[in-house]
């Protein structure tokens, strides 16, 4: 409203000046400077009587209609960049706040069993000190699926998987998603799972993987973030594979030392 009143006052004064000097050329009026004016925003409505009587004024008004900056694109880009930086900072703050506010969900016993079955294992209970589950190596292997990963295992092997939520150290597990069984004499392939095959394991420890650095950068936004991540892992020891005929181990009889010494003596005498 202030700019509108100012413009009306200027138009009124201009009419008095132009009425006295009507014989001036159009080029002489381009040098007139209007002091004490500050037109910043808003649309200005010119005086109709002035534009009707002075046709050159409309042409001069159109030529003077411009923004008070060297380039309109510069201001737009600066505003967009500042808004982008603010948005990035807000996103980073929201991410940190959400990480701090994260709360572990409580599962019921039935939900724990269902979740474990979807991953591919079943908790059989804690390992007792009197139990002897670890056996010597047997020439049998199996391919099991735990979560989204597959492992080729034999008894006595140790594997690292993504952390299994519902088991503790020294718990006995039964891996139910067996995809393949094999030995020296036969191979059994599941479609996709072998229902009668099981692989037994024991939880040895819950550990953390090596730190992975994650660097994020956005061009022209002055946005740089470096974060570290350590994946939680579970170490399993395979104890037994069931569902396939195991070949009998070949027993190799070693000759006694007395027989070896007698044989060497006979060779020397001969």
From Swiss-Prot:
GO terms for biological process: double fertilization forming a zygote and endosperm; embryo sac development; karyogamy; polar nucleus fusion; pollen development; translation. This is Large ribosomal subunit protein bL21m. The keyword RNA-binding applies. It comes from Arabidopsis thaliana (Mouse-ear cress). Residues 1-68 form a transit peptide. Component of the mitochondrial ribosome large subunit. Residues 75-101 have a biased composition (Acidic residues). Signal peptide: none annotated. One of its GO terms (molecular function) is rRNA binding. It is found in: Mitochondrion. PROSITE patterns: RIBOSOMAL_L21.
């Amino acid at each position: 409203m202030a700019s509108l009143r100012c413009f009306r006052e200027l138009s009124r004064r201009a009419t008095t000046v132009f009425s006295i000097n009507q014989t001036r050329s159009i080029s002489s009026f381009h040098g007139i400077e209007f002091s004490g004016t500050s037109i910043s925003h808003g649309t200005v409505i010119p005086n109709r009587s002035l534009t009707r009587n002075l046709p050159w004024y409309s042409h001069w008004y159109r030529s003077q209609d411009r923004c008070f900056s060297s380039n309109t694109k510069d201001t737009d880009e600066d505003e967009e960049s500042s808004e982008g930086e603010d948005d990035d900072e807000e996103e980073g703050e929201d991410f940190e706040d959400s990480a701090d506010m994260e709360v572990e969900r409580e599962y019921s016993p039935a939900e724990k069993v269902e979740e474990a079955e979807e991953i591919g294992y079943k908790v059989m209970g804690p390992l007792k000190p009197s139990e002897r589950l670890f056996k010597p190596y047997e020439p049998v292997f199996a391919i099991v699926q735990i979560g989204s990963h597959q492992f080729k295992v034999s008894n006595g092997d140790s594997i690292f998987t993504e952390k299994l939520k519902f088991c503790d150290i020294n718990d006995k597990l039964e891996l139910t998603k067996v995809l393949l069984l094999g030995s020296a004499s036969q191979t059994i392939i599941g479609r996709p799972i072998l229902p009668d095959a099981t692989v037994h394991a024991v939880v040895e420890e819950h550990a953390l993987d090596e730190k992975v650095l994650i660097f994020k950068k956005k061009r022209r936004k002055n946005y740089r973030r470096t974060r570290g991540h350590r994946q939680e892992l579970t170490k399993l020891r395979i104890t037994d594979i069931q569902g396939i005929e195991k070949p009998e181990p070949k027993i190799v009889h070693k000759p006694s030392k007395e027989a070896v010494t007698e044989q060497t003596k006979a060779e020397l005498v001969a």
